[in-house]
Design a protein with these regions (language model features):
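Structural signature of Gram-negative outer-membrane beta-barrels, strongest in the C-terminal barrel
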Residues: 223-225, 318-320, 341-473, 563
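Gram-negative outer-membrane beta-barrel transporters
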Residues: 319, 356-362, 463-474, 492-588, ...
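Flexible loop and strand-edge segments within Gram-negative outer membrane beta-barrel domains
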Residues: 200-211, 221, 225-278, 284-301, ...
C-alpha cells in the first residue's frame, strides 16, 4: 500500500536523525534532513499532503526555524535568530540573493515545484556554502524521473485546488517523459488566482492577484556515470498589494505590483564510484520587483560551484572527504536610472574530512573566502569607485561519539564569516552621495553546539528517536547600511549579538502511527549597539540594526504532529499544532520592552491516494487550517507591539479550508 511505504520512509528518516549531528525533522509538508551527515530522505508526496502554498507550510515545524509572512510577497525565514539575509539559500544549487526591498520577501518559491528541502540549522559544516551565518537551506526541484513509474516513457499530472480564506483557485499541469534511454524532460506550470484574505478578527490581509510559476528541465545520462541537465524556473507574484507587503493591514497605498524570480541552471554530474561523486553547477538568478512607487528594483546573481565527495575505507577507518570551490557575483539594479550599481565578487574553496573510527567520528574542515564589494565614495558630481576586500579562513570541527548502541553525544565548533552584500536595491536607487568606510570589518562569529541523540528500534516497522541540542553563537561586527548626517550612504559596524538556545525533538513511529513533538528556545543579547536617530515618532534611544539578525528575541516554540495511515483504504489523516509562548522582549532597534502575545494554531488534514485499481493516480488532499479561527500574528514580524499602530500588524489568515485534487496518468 502507498501509505505503508510512506511510513517506511518516515521511519528511515528517524534513523537518519540519529546518524548525524545536524539533526532531522520530518514535516507535515515535506521531509527535511540535516546536511551534516550526508543522509537525505525525501518523500515528495508529503508536500501535497499539507496543501503547502508557502515556504512556512513546509518549514514551520523544524526546531530552530521561524518563518514569517502571510503571502508570497513577504515570506521570510529566520534560523537561530538570523534572517534569511544571513543564511545560504540555494535552489538546485543556485544561490539566492534577493535583497530588493526590506519590506518584501527576498525568497520567491513555489512549493509545488519542490521535491526536497535540505536544512542545516546553525553553521557546522564548511561544505554548506559561503556566508552562512545561521545555517543553510537547499531547495531541489522535481525531476521527470521522480514522477514516472518503472517502464513508463511519458506521463502527465493535472491538479486543481481551492482555498476558502482568500477565495483562491489554483491549477497546475506537469508533463514528463523519457523518450529515449538516458534522456528525460519535465515541463510544469502552476497558476493561482485569489482575493484579499481575512484574519481571525476579520481584517483584510494579503493582496488581490495572480501567481504564476513554471519549470522546464532537460537531463541526459550517458556512459553510466555521467549526467548533464539544464533547467529554467520562473516564479512571479503580481496583483494589488500594499507598498510594504509585510504591513499587511495597511491598504491606503494598495496598487498593482509585481515581484518575480528567474533561475537558470546548467549542471554536470560524474559519479563513477564511491571514490568520486562530482557535481558542477553554473547558474544565473534574477530577482525583480516592478512597483509604481519604487519603480524597477532587482538583484542579479551569477555563479559556478564544484563540489565533490570521496569515500575511502581502510580497515577500521572510513573517510568521507568533501571538497570543492565556489564563485558567485551579485549586482543590484534600480531602473530606469540605475546610477550607482554595486557588485560583489566572492571566491571560496573548502575541504572537510569525516573520519569514522567505529563509534567515533571526527570531522575537521576549513574554508577560505575572498570577498570583494565594488562600491563608491564621494558626493554627487564627484563619485568615485571604492572596493572593499576581505580574506578569511573559517575552520570547523565536529565530534560524534556513540556511547552505547543508539545513543550518541556530539559537539561542534565553526567560525562563520560574511562580507558586505550589495546594498538593498531600493536604497541604491535613491543614493547620490557615498561615504566609504575604510575601517569596515566583515561580520564574523564563533558557533558552538553540543547535544545528545538516541534511536531505538521497537520492531521492523516501529521505532523512536530523541534529539537534544544546546547552541551558542557569538557574532561581532554586524554591518548596517546607514545614512549619515549629510545624506551620504555609509556602511558601518553596529555591534554584535550573542544568540543561544535549546532545540528538542522526539519522534515515535508505531507501524501506521507517527508522532512528533519539538521545542525551541532562543535568547538574543545585543552587544555594543550604535545609536541612531529615531523614526516615526519612536521614543529613544534608538539603535542601528543589521538586516542579517532577526527583529527581536522570540517566544518559545512548541510543535506537535500526529499522522495515521489507513492502508486498507489508502487514506492518511493528520493533526498539526504549533504554539508560541508569550514573552517580554526588547527589539534590536530600541530598549522598549514589549510583551509578544502567545498563540496556538491547529490544523487537520487528510489525503486519499489509491495505490491500485482504476483510480490509481488520483490524489485528494483536504484540510482545515487554523481550525479554531485564532487571531494571531507571527512573532517573527517586524512589528512586535500589536497594540500599537494597527496598520503595521501582519495578521495571519483565519480559518482556511483547502482542497487539492490531482491525477497522474
Amino acid at each position: 500500500m502507498r501509505f505503508s511505504g510512506l511510513f517506511k520512509l518516515s521511519l528511515a528518516a528517524s534513523v537518519a536523525v540519529c546518524a548525524n549531528a545536524a539533526g532531522e525533522s520530518v514535516l507535515s509538508g515535506v521531509e527535511v534532513t540535516g546536511m551534516g551527515g550526508g543522509a537525505n530522505t525525501v518523500d515528495d508526496i508529503k508536500i501535497s499532503t499539507r496543501n503547502a502554498g508557502l515556504v512556512k507550510d513546509v518549514m514551520r515545524d523544524i526546531p530552530g526555524v521561524y518563518v514569517g509572512g502571510t503571502n508570497g510577497m513577504n515570506q521570510k525565514i529566520y534560523m537561530r535568530g538570523v534572517s534569511d539575509r544571513g543564511l545560504n539559500i540555494t535552489i538546485d544549487g543556485a544561490k539566492q540573493n534577493g535583497n530588493t526591498f526590506h519590506h518584501n520577501a527576498d525568497l520567491l518559491i513555489d512549493p509545488d515545484l519542490i521535491k526536497a528541502v535540505e536544512v542545516e540549522v546553525g553553521s557546522k559544516s564548511v561544505a554548506n556554502g559561503s556566508g552562512a551565518l545561521g545555517g543553510s537551506v537547499a531547495f531541489k526541484t522535481v525531476d521527470a524521473k521522480d514522477l514516472l513509474e518503472s517502464g513508463e516513457i511519458i506521463g502527465a499530472k493535472i491538479r486543481s485546488g481551492y482555498a476558502s480564506n482568500s477565495s483562491e483557485f489554483s491549477q497546475g499541469l506537469m508533463l514528463f517523459t523519457t523518450p529515449v534511454e538516458g534522456l528525460d524532460f519535465i515541463a510544469a506550470i502552476n497558476h493561482k488566482g485569489y482575493d484579499y484574505g481575512k484574519s481571525g478578527n476579520g481584517n483584510k490581509i494579503g493582496g488581490d492577484g495572480n501567481d504564476l510559476s513554471y519549470l522546464l528541465k532537460l537531463g541526459y545520462s550517458f556512459l553510466d556515470a555521467h549526467r548533464i541537465s539544464i533547467s529554467r524556473e520562473h516564479n512571479e507574484f503580481k496583483g494589488i498589494y500594499p507598498i510594504r507587503a509585510e504591513f499587511g493591514s495597511s491598504h491606503a497605498n494598495d496598487d498593482y505590483r509585481k515581484y518575480e524570480r528567474d533561475t537558470t541552471t546548467l549542471k554536470y554530474e560524474y559519479k563513477p564510484s564511491n571514490l568520486l561523486n562530482l557535481e558542477v553547477t553554473a547558474y544565473n538568478t534574477e530577482h525583480k520587483k516592478d512597483d509604481p512607487v519604487l519603480k524597477i528594483l532587482g538583484v542579479k546573481t551569477n555563479g559556478i560551484n564544484a563540489k565533490a565527495k570521496s569515500v575511502v575505507e581502510s580497515g577500521a577507518l572510513t573517510q568521507t572527504f568533501r571538497y570543492g570551490t565556489e564563485f558567485y557575483q551579485s549586482k543590484n539594479f534600480s531602473k530606469p536610472d540605475n546610477h550607482y550599481p554595486e557588485k560583489v565578487n566572492n571566491y571560496s574553496i573548502y575541504a572537510e574530512d569525516a573520519l569514522n573510527f567505529s563509534s567515533l567520528t571526527i570531522t575537521p574542515g576549513i574554508r577560505y573566502t575572498h570577498h570583494e564589494l565594488k562600491s563608491y565614495d564621494g558626493k554627487a558630481g564627484n563619485v568615485k569607485s571604492y572596493t572593499y576586500k576581505f580574506n578569511e579562513f573559517t575552520p570547523a570541527l565536529a565530534l560524534d561519539y556513540e556511547i552505547v548502541k543508539g545513543l550518541n553525544a556530539f559537539v561542534s565548533y565553526a567560525k562563520v564569516f560574511r562580507g558586505p552584500d550589495v546594498i538593498e536595491s531600493m536604497y541604491a536607487g535613491r543614493a547620490k552621495n557615498f561615504e566609504a568606510n575604510k575601517n569596515l570589518k566583515a561580520t564574523t562569529g564563533n558557533s558552538y553546539e553540543t547535544g545528545l541523540k538516541y534511536h531505538g528500534d521497537i520492531s521492523e516497522a516501529s521505532s523512536y528517536s530523541l534529539s537534544a541540542k544546546y547552541f551558542m553563537t557569538k557574532y561581532k561586527n554586524l554591518i548596517v547600511d546607514s545614512n549619515t548626517a549629510n545624506g551620504a550612504l555609509k556602511r558601518i559596524n553596529a555591534g554584535g549579538a550573542d544568540i543561544s538556545g535549546v532545540e528538542l525533538l522526539a519522534r515515535l513511529n508505531l507501524d501506521a502511527l507517527s508522532l512528533a513533538v519539538s521545542y525551541t528556545h532562543q535568547s538574543v543579547k545585543y552587544k555594543d549597539r550604535v545609536l541612531t536617530s529615531c523614526r516615526r515618532g519612536a521614543i529613544g534611544p534608538c539603535y542601528s540594526t543589521s538586516n542579517v539578525i532577526g527583529y527581536r528575541d522570540q517566544g518559545d516554540k512548541y510543535t506537535f504532529n500526529a499522522e495515521y495511515a489507513f492502508s486498507s483504504i489508502d487514506t492518511l489523516v493528520g493533526y498539526n499544532l504549533i504554539y508560541f509562548a508569550s514573552k517580554n522582549t526588547v527589539s534590536a532597534g530600541n530598549d522598549k520592552s514589549v510583551n509578544i502575545p502567545s498563540y496556538a494554531v491547529s490544523d487537520i488534514y487528510a489525503t486519499y491516494s489509491p495505490s491500485s485499481g482504476k483510480f490509481k493516480g488520483l490524489e485528494i488532499n483536504a484540510g482545515i487550517y487554523n481550525l479554531f479561527n485564532k487571531v494571531y500574528a507571527s512573532q517573527s514580524q517586524r512589528t512586535a507591539d500589536y497594540t500599537g499602530d494597527p496598520n503595521y500588524v501582519d495578521w495571519e489568515p483565519g480559518r482556511n479550508f483547502k482542497v487539492n485534487v490531482s491525477y497522474k496518468f
